[in-house]
């Protein structure tokens, strides 16, 4: 007997710096409601889905920087998203900037959560592979200061039971690293999902700009195929505060085939019928980890 569900990606168009959280949550609610009307069981939203991508600026005012972070989840503004999800019986994945205070010290993470169909948070992930730089670089048309505004995640790559599926998360740059996928594949993840804010221009290597979409989809397709898992990636896309962000949010099958792909640079919901048992098909007959892996030869991967 197959285990079927409808999976969705809720791509966001650009978020202006002046746009309020209330406005952004309203847009997310529209997509959540749209997805539920189409029979969706779970929807994936982007990285840092509640604000503009603030690491493109160099802030010297700590209070201004802190305004982009969430100190509780859900807070009063975001709570309607959870309540509506529970009313509609639909789960979701949401990315946001997390600020916690431990021992009087502020800690900042690029975070993602899994919420089940009852509106309960059942999983959390903090971005591990932080791209960009730590200090201001004058030559750039925009900054990419994730290494300044976040510390690397400290939760590993957990896999959670979310309603009927085993799910894991990545955030943006994580999708480019095979270790991200393999750890969750070894843990039995059936759906690996996450969000991204990917500029189409990379100032250090502009000769790669024409490959931005290719590398994004290559990472998603290879990760899904080599680990026998469904995957879903939700982008924040379009011209956001002078920076063009990549579209092509997608859903990928365990075979590596793209089964749904966005076609716009604005808020858009795409869906796919997902048979979770197809993961077993790949893991038994092609990537059978127990039968074929030789981990005694892989030590170098964890040493450097």
UniProtKB/Swiss-Prot annotation:
Homotetramer. PANTHER family: NITRILASE C965.09-RELATED (PTHR43674:SF12). SUPFAM superfamilies: Carbon-nitrogen hydrolase. InterPro entries: Aliph_Amidase/BUP, C-N_Hydrolase, C-N_Hydrolase_sf. Pfam families: CN_hydrolase. The enzyme catalyzes the hydrolysis of N-carbamoyl-D-amino acids to the corresponding which are useful intermediates in the preparation of beta-lactam antibiotics. Industrial production of beta-lactam antibiotics is now being developed using this enzyme. The lineage of its organism: Bacteria, Pseudomonadati, Pseudomonadota, Alphaproteobacteria, Hyphomicrobiales. Its EC number is 3.5.1.77. It comes from the Bacteria. Signal peptide: none annotated. Keywords: Hydrolase. This is N-carbamoyl-D-amino acid hydrolase. It catalyses: an N-carbamoyl-D-amino acid + H2O + 2 H(+) = a D-alpha-amino acid + NH4(+) + CO2. Residues 5-276 form the CN hydrolase domain.
